[in-house]
Amino acid sequence: MAKKVSKFFRIGVEGDTCDGRVISAQDIQEMAETFDPRVYGCRINLEHLRGILPDGIFKRYGDVAELKAEKIDDDSALKGKWALFAKITPTDDLIAMNKAAQKVYTSMEIQPNFANTGKCYLVGLAVTDDPASLGTEYLEFCRTAKHNPLNRFKLSPENLISVATPVELEFEDLPETVFTALTEKVKSIFGRKQASDDARLNDVHEAVTAVAEHVQEKLSATEQRLAEMETAFSALKQEVTDRADETSQAFTRLKNSLDHTESLTQQRRSKATGGGGDALMTNC
């Protein structure tokens, strides 16, 4: 099954957080500028809860792939505010929840001084069902509470958690590569439940055969493409050579023609001054 990637959707807007602090337009822009999954990957969790079991309800539900910052330009009350937009690569469970109209809001976890850079970074993205749990009513409680109840959900106490934002997720297939296609094929083979060692050995043999056939198929296709490129290059080389010869011959003909053509700017010899010039003398 091909992996999915979402289109860009809004995950947060400048404004209040759940502890009374404010996310500024600069914070939004910094998160878009600094985000790099190779430096720190931002994973998607449920209700800002990070479970440790891969099969538990609070497992991870995908990753943030890209971020961008844009000003909102619509007829809503948010017009003119800076917003953060994300592309995500979801798990099948998140896609299923979204199709069932569950967990349709997002809430950001922001680290203000990420890695001592002095800039904000998106370190977590939660999906939630009820905006009130991270919205106005909950916001007021967190402002006045002696101990912020959200602190236990944060990676660091100084991190900010944004008010939840409703989202509409649209997914598209990621292009399938040779590696992903082969991986899925082998995984499907080893995913079968077998009772005996002979059956497992057969699975290993089938997997090795599948790998060999897949590699051979891709090598043959690559060789064919290389042969086509070589043929095209040879034809192009011959065409360039022919044109160069034609140009050289044309230049030689032009040079020879010019060498045998009298120059109109060349100085002429003056007429002879002896005798009477053009007069004819008669001896009488």
Curated annotation (Swiss-Prot):
Modification comment: Autocleaves itself into an N-terminal fragment containing the protease activity, that remains in the capsid following maturation.
Which residues are in coiled coils? 206-243
- Taxonomically, which superkingdom? Viruses
A GO biological-process term? viral procapsid maturation
**Is this entry keyworded Protease?**
yes
Class of the enzyme per the UniProt entry, highest EC level: hydrolase
**Positions of region (Disordered):** 258-284
The record places the site described as Cleavage at 141-142
Q: Which residues form the active site?
A: 19, 48, 107
UniProt keyword annotation of Membrane present: no
Q: What is its EC number?
A: 3.4.21.-
**What GO molecular-function term can you cite, just one?**
serine-type peptidase activity
State one Pfam family annotation. Answer: Phage_GPO
Entries under InterPro entries matching the protein: Capsid_scaffold_GpO (IPR009228)
* Family statement: Belongs to the P2likevirus scaffolding protein family.
**Record's function text:** Scaffolding protein and protease involved in the icosahedric procapsid assembly. Coassembles with the capsid proteins to form the procapsid, in which the scaffolding protein is found within the external shell of icosahedrally arranged capsid protein subunits. In a subsequent step the scaffolding protein molecules are cleaved by the viral protease activity.
Q: What is this protein called?
A: Capsid assembly scaffolding protein
Q: Which organism is it from?
A: Escherichia phage P2 (Bacteriophage P2)
Its organism's taxonomic lineage begins at: Viruses, Duplodnaviria, Heunggongvirae, Uroviricota, Caudoviricetes
